[in-house]
Amino acid sequence: MSFAHYSEKIFSEHLDLFNIQWIYEPTSFPLKWGSGSIKMMFTPDFYLPELDVYVEITTMNQNLITKKQKKIKLAKKLYPNKNFKLINESQFYNFLNSDN
């Protein structure tokens, strides 16, 4: 499988290690519309069906973190029945180093 970023590959391998079922970029959520078309989409990196959560992985690039935080906030507002989680680099490494 091809991933957009190496951190997504590592995250998927750790999910596999813990036998956590995952689906890569399963759904795109429209966030903004205009002139009869979708102007902004949000496609979370992973969906974890057993936990019913959509996960977006982000690195330490502050511009990306801010953009993703805004998209997640808007997605939560537009899709309140969905569970979205942004995992930043430090949370990601804490997860990888945990003994779960």
Enumerate the language-model features and the residues they cover.
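Electrostatic, structured charged patches in enzyme active sites and in nucleic-acid/phosphate-binding
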Residues: 1-100
